[in-house]
Swiss-Prot record:
Biological source species: Francisella tularensis subsp. tularensis (strain WY96-3418)
HAMAP family per record: SecA
GO biological process terms on file: intracellular protein transmembrane transport; protein import; protein targeting; protein transport by the Sec complex
Region feature Disordered, mapped onto this chain: 853-906
Annotated localization: Cell inner membrane; Cytoplasm
Oligomer status and interactors: Monomer and homodimer. Part of the essential Sec protein translocation apparatus which comprises SecA, SecYEG and auxiliary proteins SecDF-YajC and YidC.
Name of protein: Protein translocase subunit SecA
Biased composition (Basic residues): 896-906
InterPro entries given in the database record: Helicase_ATP-bd, Helicase_C-like, P-loop_NTPase, SEC_C_motif, SecA, SecA_CS, SecA_DEAD, SecA_motor_DEAD
Keyword Repressor assigned: no
Basic and acidic residues bias (residue ranges): 853-865, 877-888
GO MF term set: ATP binding; metal ion binding; protein-exporting ATPase activity
Positions of Zn(2+) binding: 890, 892, 901-902
Known role: Part of the Sec protein translocase complex. Interacts with the SecYEG preprotein conducting channel. Has a central role in coupling the hydrolysis of ATP to the transfer of proteins into and across the cell membrane, serving both as a receptor for the preprotein-SecB complex and as an ATP-driven molecular motor driving the stepwise translocation of polypeptide chains across the membrane.
C-alpha cells in the first residue's frame, strides 16, 4: 500500500526536490539579466543585498538573486557554472539540512551558494572540513568567487597564532577543521582578557563530510588537559605481568582443565579475567609487594590497580600494531578505524594509551587532568543553524535527525550514475581471498583499467602490497604511513593500468579523475607555454578515453567495513560525473565482521562447502553481511546516544559556567557581582552555624565567630552581643554578619587605586571559577566511572548520575563563591602591576596544557571525559548475603550473569 502511494505522490525526498526546483527555475530565469551586468554592477549586488537585509528583508527572499550572483561570479572568476542540481544542493544547505551528493558532484562549489547568502548578515559563516589540507585547498579554490563579490575569506589551521586566528574568524567566511573550531571555543572560555578570545558568534556552519564528523567522531570528545600524577611505574609493572596470563579461547569451557586466565569479547573490545586469572595475578602482585598477604583485588581501595590491570590486559589482547596504531618517532599514533588515517595528538583514554606505550617500550606519558571538554554533538548545537554535505548520509538519516534535527535530502546527480556493482565473493580463508584479489587486479590492468583497492588496516594493505610485488605488479600504497604523499598518489590513481592500495578511502576529499588529474599535471609544469598545456591536454584526453573503454575505475574492497556507509564511500570513488566504473568486494569467513557477528554454525557450513580457492557469490550472503553491519551500526548508535545522554548533564553545567565566566570577562567593573556574592556567602556561612528557624540551643555562635576570623579576618563577638541583648533574633544576627563582611571589604579597599582593585577582583573571580570547574570535571569523571555500582541498590545509574551531578555542581558553585570572597578578604589587594604579573604567571603555569581529540577507546567504556589520576576511594561495606559467584545472576536485576554485568572492571 505504501509503495502504491509513493508511486502516485512520490517519496518525501522527491516531493522536496520538486518543490525547490521551482526556486531553481527562478534562479535560471535571472541568469540572462545577470550576464549583462558589468563586473562593478555585479560586485555592487553584495552591498544592495545587505541594505535590503538591514531594511527588514529576509534571506529566503534574497536567495534566488544571491544564488544567481554567485553563479555568475563563478563563471567570471573560475570558469565554473553551478549546475541545477548544485543549486538544489545549495538550497538544501541554506535550509539547514544535509545534502547527500555523489562523489565528483562538486560539493566544494555548492558550498559557495549558501555561504555567500548567509554571510550577508555580517555574522559570519563557518565551513568545516576534515583536515587542514582540505580547509586550505577549498578556501583557496573558492576565494576568487567570494573576494570578487566583496566577501573576506579566512582559514583556521593548526599552526596559526591567536592574532591570526582572530583575523580569520573576523572574515565573512571562515574555513577550518572541526577540531580547530572546537578547541578555539574551549580556549576562548579559558581566556583572562576579552582581547585574548578569537571567535565571534556561531551563526551558521556548513560541515563537509558531515557523517564522518557528526557520527564517526561523535564518540570522541575534544579535551584540553594538563598533566596529573605520574603513574608510569604501575603501567610498566602490569605490562610486565600481563604476558604471563594465558588466554582462554571462549567464555565458557567444558571443564576446569581447559580454564585459562582470561578471555576476550571482541564485539565489545573488552577482556575479562577468570577466577583462575584473578588468583594468578593476585599472587604475582603479592610477590611484587604491591598487595598485602591478606589483601585481594576485589577490595575497593584496589580500584586503581584494577584500572592499570584492565588497561594492560586490553592493550595486549585487543590492540595490534599496524592495525590499531603505529609507532612513529617513539610515540604511539592511533589509526582511525573509519579512515585509516594516522591521528597524531589523539590519545585513548582510561589508561589504554599509557598501557600501549608500556607494551611497545616507548615513554609512558602521564595521564592527564581534564580542564575543559566538549563533544562535537554539543559543540555544533551551539550554532544557530547547521547544514552538512556528504556522499553517504542516507544510511545514517535516522541518527542525524534524532540527535541533530537534520533532515537528509538526496540530491540527483548531474549525469546518470552508471557504476556496475558486482556481487561480493566470499572465500574460506584470508589467503585465498587475497590470491583472488591479485588475480582480479592482474586481469583488469591487462586491459588498461585502473584499480583502487580499499583495505581495512595497514597490515592488510602491506600484505597485499607484498603479494603484488611478487607478481611484479606496479602499485602505490596509501595508508597512515604514507599520509604525506596522499594528494600525489590520488592524482595518479585514475591513470590507465594504475593500481592504488588505500586504507579506508573515507574522507580523502580528493576526486579520482579518469586518465589522471589534468590540473595537477599542468600545475607541476614550470612556466608552461600554451603549446605545452595543449599537448598535456591532448595526452590526457587520450588516457581518459582509454580508461573509459576499459570500464572506468574499478573499486575492489578487501573486506566489508563495520558500517555500510564506509563501504558506500569506497564504492563512491568510482563512476563520478557519469563516468563508467565498477565495484566488487572480496570477503573471507575469517574477516572480523563475519567472524564476530555471523553465527558460528553458518561459518562452519560455508567453510566446509568451499574447496580450496572456491568462492560464493549470491544474494543470501549479502543479506547475512547486511544484517551483521546493521547490528554493528545499531550498537554504535546506542553508544553515541548513551554518550549524549551523559554528556548533556555536563553540557548544561558547562553552559552555565561559560555564560557566567563570559559575564565576568566582559564586565568593566565586577564590584556589583562581588557584592551579590558576598550576600550569598554571608547567608551560607550564617546558616552553616545557625540552622534556619532553629532554637537558640542549636546555634553555634562560637563556631561562627571562629569561621569569620579564620576565613574572613573579621573579629565579631556575636555571643557577647546576644548576651547583652537577647532580643536579637536570627535575622538580626544574619544582618550583623552580612554588614561585617561588607564593612571589612570597604575598609580594606578605600585607600587603594580603584583600577587596581577592579582588575584584581576580576582576576580572582576568573581564577577561582576555573580552578573549581576543573576540580568539578574531575569529580564528575570519578562519578561517571563508579555510577554503575548503583545498580546493586536497584537504582537507575543514569538517574543517579543526573541527581548526583547536580548536587556536585551546586556544591561547587557554593564553594567557588565562598572561596573567592574568603580569598579577597585574606589576601592583600595587589597593585595593578602586581595583578598583571600574577595573571601572567598563572597563564604561564597553564602553558603546558594539551588540546586532544580523545580517540574512541571501545564500545563499552565512557567517552565524554579524559581519564583522571585516581578514582576516589569507596567506603568498604560488608556483604550481608552470600557471595555472588561470577556465573550467578547479577543482583542488579539486569538478567545478565554477574561477570558480564557488575563484575566488569570499569
Amino acid at each position: 500500500m505504501l509503495s502504491l502511494v509513493q508511486k502516485i505522490i512520490g517519496s518525501r525526498n522527491e516531493r522536496f526536490i520538486k518543490k525547490v526546483s521551482r526556486i531553481v527555475q527562478k534562479i535560471n530565469s535571472l541568469e540572462p539579466e545577470f550576464e549583462k551586468l558589468s563586473d562593478e554592477q555585479l560586485k555592487a549586488k553584495t552591498f544592495e543585498y545587505r541594505e535590503r537585509l538591514a531594511n527588514g528583508e529576509i534571506l529566503d527572499n534574497l536567495l534566488p538573486e544571491a544564488f544567481a550572483t554567485v553563479r555568475e561570479a563563478g563563471k567570471r572568476t573560475k570558469n565554473m557554472r553551478h549546475y541545477d542540481v548544485q543549486l538544489i544542493g545549495g538550497i538544501v544547505l541554506h535550509q539547514g539540512k544535509v545534502a547527500e551528493m555523489r562523489t565528483g558532484e562538486g560539493k566544494t562549489l555548492v558550498a559557495t551558494l549558501p555561504a555567500y547568502l548567509n554571510a550577508l548578515t555580517g555574522d559570519g559563516v563557518h565551513v568545516i572540513t576534515v583536515n587542514d589540507y582540505l580547509a586550505k585547498r577549498d578556501a583557496e579554490l573558492m576565494s576568487d568567487i567570494y573576494e570578487f563579490l566583496g566577501m573576506s575569506v579566512g582559514v583556521i589551521v593548526a599552526d596559526l597564532n591567536p592574532q591570526q586566528r582572530k583575523e580569520a574568524y573576523a572574515c565573512d567566511i571562515t574555513y577550518g577543521t572541526n577540531n580547530e573550531f572546537g578547541f578555539d571555543y574551549l580556549r576562548d572560555n579559558m581566556a583572562y582578557e576579552k582581547e585574548q578570545q578569537v571567535q565571534r558568534s556561531r551563526n551558521y556552519v556548513i560541515i563537509d563530510e558531515v557523517d564522518s564528523i557528526l557520527i564517526d567522531e561523535a564518540r570522541t570528545p575534544l579535551i584540553i588537559s594538563g598533566a596529573s600524577d605520574d603513574s608510569s611505574e604501575m603501567y610498566n609493572l602490569f605490562n610486565r605481568l600481563v604476558p604471563y596470563l594465558e588466554k582462554q579461547e571462549k567464555e565458557e569451557v567444558e571443564n576446569e582443565q581447559e580454564q585459562r586466565d582470561f578471555y576476550v569479547d571482541e564485539k565489545s573490545k573488552n577482556a575479562y579475567l577468570t577466577e583462575k586469572g584473578y588468583a594468578k595475578i593476585e599472587n604475582m602482585l603479592k610477590k611484587e609487594g604491591i598487595l598485602e598477604e591478606d589483601d585481594n583485588l576485589y577490595s575497593p581501595h584496589n580500584i586503581t590497580k584494577m584500572h592499570y590491570l584492565n588497561a594492560c590486559l586490553r592493550a595486549h589482547s585487543l590492540y595490534q600494531l599496524n592495525i590499531d596504531y603505529i609507532v612513529r618517532d617513539q610515540e604511539i599514533v592511533i589509526i582511525d578505524e573509519s579512515t585509516g588515517r594516522a591521528m597524531p595528538g589523539r590519545r585513548w583514554s582510561d589508561g589504554l594509551h599509557q598501557a600501549i606505550e608500556a607494551k611497545e617500550g616507548v615513554k609512558v606519558n602521564a595521564e592527564n587532568q581534564t580542564m575543559a571538554s566538549i563533544t562535537f554533538q554539543n559543540f555544533f548545537k551551539l550554532y544557530n543553524k547547521i547544514a552538512g554535505m556528504t556522499g553517504t548520509a542516507d544510511t545514517e538519516a535516522f541518527e542525524l535527525h534524532s540527535i541533530y534535527g537534520l533532515e537528509v535530502i538526496i540530491i540527483p546527480t548531474n549525469k546518470p550514475m552508471i557504476r556496475k556493482d558486482h556481487h561480493d565473493e566470499i572465500y574460506g580463508s584470508v589467503s585465498e581471498k587475497f590470491d583472488a584479489i591479485v588475480e582480479d587486479i592482474k586481469e583488469r590492468i591487462s586491459k588498461g583499467q585502473p584499480v583502487l583497492v580499499g583495505t581495512a588496516s595497514i597490515e592488510a594493505s602491506e600484505v597485499l602490497s607484498t603479494l603484488l610485488k611478487k607478481k611484479k605488479i606496479r602499485h602505490n600504497v596509501l595508508n597512515a604511513k604514507q599520509h604525506e604523499k596522499e594528494a600525489s598518489i590520488i592524482a595518479m590513481a585514475g591513470y590507465p593500468d594504475n593500481v592504488t592500495i588505500a586504507t579506508n578511502m573515507a574522507g580523502r576529499g580528493t576526486d579520482i579523475i579518469l586518465g589522471g588529474n589534468l590540473e595537477v599535471e599542468i600545475a607541476q609544469l614550470e612556466d608552461p607555454t600554451p603549446e605545452d598545456i595543449a599537448q598535456i591536454k591532448a595526452e590526457w584526453l587520450k588516457r581518459n578515453e582509454a580508461v573509459k573503454k576499459a570500464g572506468g575505475l574499478c573499486i575492489i574492497g578487501s573486506e566489508r567495513h563495520d558500517s555500510r556507509r564506509i563501504d558506500n564511500q569506497l564504492r563512491g570513488r568510482a563512476a563520478r560525473q557519469g563516468d563508467p566504473g565498477e565495484s566488487k568486494f572480496y570477503l573471507s569467513m575469517d574477516d572480523n565482521l563475519l567472524r564476530i557477528f555471523a553465527s558460528q554454525s553458518m561459518a562452519e557450513r560455508v567453510k566446509k562447502g568451499l574447496k580450496g580457492g572456491e568462492s560464493l557469490a549470491f544474494g543470501f550472503m549479502s543479506k547475512v553481511i547486511s544484517k551483521a553491519q546493521g547490528k554493528v551500526e545499531s550498537y554504535h548508535f546506542d553508544i553515541r546516544k548513551n554518550l549524549l545522554e551523559y554528556d548533556n548533564v555536563v553540557n548544561t553545567q558547562r553552559k552555565v559556567i561559560y555564560e557566567q565566566r563570559q559575564s565576568f570577562l566582559e564586565a568593566e567593573d565586577v564590584s556589583d557581582i562581588l557584592a551579590d556574592i558576598r550576600i550569598d556567602v554571608a547567608e551560607q556561612l550564617f546558616h552553616d552555624y545557625v540552622p534556619a528557624g532553629s532554637m537558640h540551643e542549636l546555634w553555634d555562635l562560637e563556631g561562627l565567630e571562629k569561621a569569620l576570623k579564620s576565613d574572613f579576618m573579621i573579629e565579631l563577638d556575636l555571643q557577647k552581643l546576644y548576651e547583652e541583648d537577647d532580643s536579637l533574633g536570627e535575622e538580626d544576627l544574619k544582618r550583623l554578619v552580612r554588614e561585617a563582611i561588607e564593612i571589612e571589604f570597604v575598609e580594606k579597599t578605600k585607600n587603594l587605586d580603584s583600577g587596581a582593585v577592579r582588575q584584581f577582583e576580576k582576576f580572582s573571580l576568573l581564577q577561582s571559577l576555573d580552578t573549581h570547574w576543573r576540580e568539578h570535571l574531575s569529580s564528575i569523571d570519578h562519578l561517571r566511572n563508579s555510577i554503575n555500582l548503583r545498580g546493586y541498590a536497584q537504582k537507575d545509574p543514569k538517574n543517579e548520575y543526573k541527581k548526583e551531578a547536580f548536587e556536585l555542581f551546586s556544591t561547587m558553585l557554593d564553594n567557588f563563591k565562598y572561596e573567592v570572597i574568603s580569598s579577597l578578604a585574606k589576601i592583600r589587594i595587589a597593585t595593578e602591576e602586581e595583578t598583571q604579573r600574577a595573571q601572567q604567571e598563572w597563564q604561564e603555569s597553564m602553558s603546558d596544557i594539551k588540546a586532544e581529540h580523545e580517540s574512541v577507546i571501545d564500545n563499552n567504556q565512557r567517552h565524554d571525559e579524559d581519564e583522571q589520576e585516581e578514582a576516589p576511594k569507596v567506603q568498604q561495606v560488608r556483604r550481608e548475603g552470600p557471595k555472588v559467584k561470577r556465573n550467578d545472576p547479577c543482583p542488579c536485576g539486569s538478567g545478565k550473569k554477574y561477570k558480564q554485568c557488575h563484575s566488569k572492571v570499569e
